[in-house]
Amino acid sequence: DEAALRRGPAPEDSPSPRRWKFSELLSEPAVKARWERVRQYFFLRESTYDMTNRCNLRCDGCYYYEGDKQFARENGDPQAWRELLRRERSRGITYVVLAGAEPSLVPDLLDVCFGEIPLGCIATNGFRRIDPAVGYRIHISVWGNDETSRRVRKARELLRRQIDNYRGDRRAVFVYTFTRENIEEASEVMDLLAAADCRVTFNVFSAPVGYAGGLRHDAESLVRTREVMLEMMSRHPRHVLFSPYNA
């Protein structure tokens, strides 16, 4: 009829995409080798804990003090933490992230956590050294050079102090957080950290709700951040722990 003529001939049925079986994917040697490298970590089940509402720095744009968590009642009882970690372990938690506000201020609680669940990491500003007996990975936040740290984090010579505290410590990974203002400082900071044989990874500042300060990224700064990340990976391949897939 006339309507059918206007529509034209019906398109041929397109074949359905093939549904691959996992075993078929693993039959490819390269895929199988990559699978075997990562499957050993499948037992990890992570949970994050804020250790204290105290901090020895006051950083612009801090996620902890921009939100309601700062008003939570602090529990500094080691036995209470021991019981909590045992309950967490019984429900399958195998990896802990110890954060907020500054966990290095409660060293006795870090000891307790490590004694119950020995896999994990601590997010710290690096101002105080954490006892080597606590064998967690240590993630040390870096927001720029010492001048920027003085302005943004109200701390003098913070990068120098961080390096002094953790130089040669195999637990330590310095986390350079890119903000809109510190992108061009990354080269200077990376050179200092690499010269001290410190390992580094990258982070991108994520503004807390309601924050409109100068650290907040825009589209242009995010593009430049990616460029600098790739430059630093190329310049310091032995010291940067990062993947181009994440840049």
Region roles according to the model:
Residues D1-L5, S90, Y136, S141-A247:
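Radical SAM enzyme [4Fe-4S]-AdoMet core and its adjacent flexible, acidic
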Residues L5-P132:
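Conserved alpha-helical substructure of the radical SAM core
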